[in-house]
Amino acid sequence: MKGILRGAYCVALSISIFLCGVILALSCRGITLYKKELLQNGMTVAITLFMAACIVMLCVYGKDKLQTTRRKFSVFLFLLIGLAQIAFLLLVSRPMTIADPARVQNEALAMLKYHHGQMDPTNSYMQNYGNNHFITICFYYFYKFLTDVGITKVWVPTVVLNVLAIDLGILLTFLSVKKMRGIGTANFALVLFFLCPTTYLWLTSVYTNTLSFPFIMGVLYLGLIDKPAKRWRMAVHDVLLAVVMAVGYRVRPTTIIPIIALGLYLTVRLIAGWQNRRALRASETMETENASEEQQHSRQRVLEGAVRVGLVVCVSMAVLFSSSNLVAKHVDAKKFNQQFPVVHWVMMGMNEKSKGGFNRNDRRYTSSFPTKEQKRKADIARLKQRVKKMGPVGLAKHFGNKMMRVWAMGDDDGITNAQYAYQYPPFFRYFAGKQNAWFMIYMQAFRIAMLFLMLCAMCRQFLQREAAPGAMYTLTFAGAVMFFMLWEAGKRYNICFTGVCLLLMAEGADGFTNTVFNKGDAWLKAHFNGMRLHAARLVVLAVGLFCFAGSFAAANQLSHPRTYVEIPYFNSKRGKDEEPIRWRYHKNPKVLEQTIEQGQLEWRNRWNRIRLYFWNLAPNESGDEYRIQVLALDDKEVLYDKTIAPNQVKREGYTIAIAKNKLKQRDSQIGYLIRLTHVGASDRLIPMICRFPLLDPYPYGELKVDGQYKDLGSIDENFSQEKCIT
């Protein structure tokens, strides 16, 4: 039994090591996928790997300097992280009222202001994504509380809530490392959080990606501190664990991954302890009386364990049942009958064209079937078709693309999402603007260093004979990687596992890596001294990373064309998050004026197209409907003037192509004025506006309807003339 257990443990760690190694290899060439050329001298890959080597060296050797630090230094580091987050919010970042976070928060506000606490059944997003009902209702009660205390502007409190959730996850990670390795290594983990870009990039994106972070670390920490104690203490511990597991699962279902990892770890530890006691009883030195007493204690431990497991299960089920009743109080199940089946996200995850990411065509495909059972059967059929078409080799390549998308890229899609606002803060350009090359290189270098030290930690765990507490975090990481190999591969889906990764990074620097480098140091110290010794250490690390990643980087540069980041020239809403302007704001608008300001991300002045969206198209009708004008904000020069009819508008919108010779080199705060004048007899073309008007924490341009300002988002979408590949 013990041999089987040891074999299963080694297999699990071997899979984890293999997955981490593959992601590390992909990450070493990931910097080439961001922009055509970050640095003009073409040394981007070399500089990234060299910077990663420097980070590894600082982690390995700088960690020892923190071993003598104590609690006061921990308080200082927490304050430093908090101040850095505040500085990032004020000087760099802007709110991200986009995509899923905006849909959830806007619906919560609509429930509060218009629907008397009931979810709107006409909201197609809420119809399809039932997994977000619980978090939407939580936001509803949060906004209701703010309204009751007199706070009507909810965006700042929402960001504060997000920051508190992230910092709570950091605190739980700190406590976990302190329990495993002592306060010195725990302080080193705080330094890693201070240096990690993910700590800052997603402060204004308030969604389950960040809100589930403390729940994941809470589940693992409560499992880590489990030990024999007084019965009432163990009961409190088990109830708290059950509540954290159940609520965390409702916030984001991926919380099931650390729950499974915790269960496997506790099972392995239980069986190993039972095997050790059994071997002790079988020894010739044990007296018969002691053996009988030990058997009685064993039966008592089994009974206590069964009671504790039963308590956790019962409390978890009670919390899940209560949360379901809470959702049912605000959601009429009879009206919400268009929810997607679970297999929908697996089917979408097998889409080669989107590399397993979100795909609108897949969503439309599933939505086209009336019942959930029909959706499930249709998604299964398409899933089988895609898997069969790819074959084993294509499937392996597809899994590699998904690992690259979710785990290997250092920005986790934070840079792209940070580009939606305008009137950028003073330091935005150096982090997410057109002068952010060095920050992007640093992000990728930190990701490479993190994966390298994580790999070292896993190798150290593999060499140990018994399951160490760190294995619980390794199993969580491996489970998350395998889960997103099958599931929809969102670029930001790994954010909630940042604490797990940084904990393993700290363990890698503290354990296996430190031992290896100490042995190497003995040879280096025998041949070098002073500054030469430090230079030799740096060269050894750099050469090691170059040897490991050089082939991957070279192969990528030789066999793949350069790719571009999808960057909006004018920063506004993207996608189909619009609604007809006539419905809620004006019955028959005659003149619409939309101001959009130029962003900082101009690339070689090749942006010259603007797309407008319309609703209620009538392609077979003729006659003039709208006169469209585009004026430059600086000198009011007319860059575009045309009258269009319904048959000129395609289903995906109407594209304005501004002549290149009229595009000028403009300041980052100058943009365009789009003017739509209704000249027809009836409204066959109704412009669309942003569908998140209730949030509007930071306007994406000014909208006028018949001369009156409306505090809304853009009615346009802007895109590059160049081919964009993400």
Predicted regions and their residues:
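Membrane-interface anchor segments at the N-terminal boundary of transmembrane helices
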Residues: 35, 39-48, 153, 157, ...
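Multi-pass, polyprenyl lipid-linked donor-dependent membrane glycosyltransferases
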Residues: 157-165, 188-223, 248-261, 493-498
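Transmembrane-helix motifs of polytopic, lipid-linked glycan transferases
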Residues: 160-180, 218, 452-459
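Transmembrane-helix signature of polytopic, membrane-embedded enzymes
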Residues: 168, 173-195, 468-471
